[in-house]
Amino acid sequence: MAAAATATAGTKGVVRQVIGPVLDVEFPAGKLPKILNALRIDGKNPSGQHIAITAEVQQLLGDHRVRAVAMSSTDGLVRGMEALDTGSAISVPVGEATLGRIFNVLGEPVDEQGPVTTDATAPIHRPAPKLTELETKPTVFETGIKVIDLLAPYRQGGKVGLFGGAGVGKTVLIQELINNIAKEHGGVSVFGGVGERTREGNDLYEEFKESGVINSDDLSKSKVALCFGQMNEPPGARMRVGLSALTMAEHFRDVNKQDVLLFIDNIFRFVQAGSEVSALLGRMPSAVGYQPTLGTDVGALQERITSTLEGSITSIQAVYVPADDLTDPAPATTFAHLDATTVLARALAAKGIYPAVDPLDSTSTMLQPSVVGDEHYRTARSVQATLQRYKELQDIIAILGLDELSEDDRRTVDRARKIEKFLSQPFFVAEIFTGMSGKYVKLEETIAGFNMILAGELDHLPEQAFYLVGNIDEVKAKAEKIASEAKG
């Protein structure tokens, strides 16, 4: 639904000062726009250059003036130009028409695919759902990815931090999650590109088209909407684009009653942009130069990402940690909101184990017996204990070799290597690259499979049979194939 316009809608003001992306606008007495209202400047400057800028009111200064932050470059903007109060917050298009399209912070399509065919819009600023509307019972969000579902399960309507360097498979993991939620949960996804490189956004879009997540022939069959505010854009755009993406996701949850995946890449850039805007507005900086409203800004975004009785928004947020300092106020504030962390390890990617999710570093608040049940909890902890023991033994193996280990330790190493291989699986979105059909593994099958490995029931099977397969039945079939090839 469109934002309700205030009584000041249509009031015209005059630009009195421009300082970079910040502008002061004077309005008639008694006609000041509200904070967070969008102002529209659309006209020609004295040089004849056409200027079209949307700015958001941030402060009321007195003397009939407001201070606003521009959502696009203010190049060419001069004093004396006319500014129109729209009477409402920035609004973006919502609904099925957004699928397969790329938008900027204002909800304008930037993919050269023509206008968006919808009249449905929603304001980017709105309160979080009331407590009475929330689904408070913790429910595991099944992804079909073994390592995540077993060791660091996602919460439906929860928030997950995704950590990983370049080239370890973040994008492929994101694509697989988008694919799986569409197929298994009938849900859609929204991708918010916040302050990252334009090249990365373009690459992601092309990969989405290649893997079928975006259907170029029929956009309505696409599974994702994209909303980008890249690092070359003013801080106002980077600060608000996360809210634009979230607003699109909320429509799918509240109106279509769907389960939605919201990706934010990168949540740190959202905080960084808020810090820049805060300094431009003349606020006193807080610790490490961040804005004094850091906790409020992050909370305003995170509290809207939740499960309601109608549907859910599960958020996966890439987290950049400046200088690897986890105590920095930006990541530290973000961590307080996360339910799970998925850590991608370069060492696993180097071994060819995909997804390269670190089974020992990844965590989840859902992994407790009261939520996932005793069997799941025991299996996950036994898998982690086996892998931890293998990690401890690796130095001994490197120096003395396997033969110097005790019988028990040799058995542990053998099972740990099978577990490590079994934590890999082929992805649907990678079929075109690997030639292997993707696998979605149900949680019960995952637990049963790892229990069999831990119990020693599969000690006789070769290690290679566990690599890049779905469930245990496929392991047995692959082992038979390996045996027959060896004979032949």
UniProtKB/Swiss-Prot annotation:
Belongs to the ATPase alpha/beta chains family. This is ATP synthase subunit beta. The gene is atpD. Its main location: membrane. Pfam families: ATP-synt_ab (PF00006), ATP-synt_ab_N (PF02874), ATP-synt_VA_C (PF22919). ATP binds at residues 164-171. Keywords: ATP synthesis, ATP-binding, CF(1), Hydrogen ion transport, Ion transport, Membrane, Nucleotide-binding, Thylakoid, Translocase, Transport. It is found in: Cellular thylakoid membrane. GO terms for cellular component: plasma membrane-derived thylakoid membrane; proton-transporting ATP synthase complex. Its EC number is 7.1.2.2.
